[in-house]
């Protein structure tokens, strides 16, 4: 069986026809230390007007937020990833709360959720950390960015049971089926489209 070669788009010659938003980036990572400015410039050239940078703990936010001082197009999201749930102590939660109090570029709590693909954190701890951070988001009146992998039903049930239907929420890197997408949209939430949708083996 022959395979048709997929022609790749050059983002610098075929920029978005209207402004776009990259809702989920980790540009504070060490892997960008050599060319962060060039990456941000290429994003602008491709039509990306707004970028959400996710800080995975308050210490990273504190040490690396300054990388974006000259880039008002970058907003911040802060939370404890489910795989790092064992690090989410009451002191860390208090630190996150304080960060939101002093930095108006912090716009959402995330990425938080459940990840049953990796075995980095016991499930019961992940549930507790998710509950704690959902409560914090309500307290701060901030939207939520959800990370979910191999735990779609559990994450949906948790959010619905805790009264988050209609709450401002972005389901990051959505990988579910059409029925799940419809349920998320009915709940008043948003979905971000991940890179894997471009893989030839994936179907709409």
Model-predicted regions and their roles:
Residues 1-204:
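Mid-domain alpha/beta scaffold segments of enzyme catalytic cores
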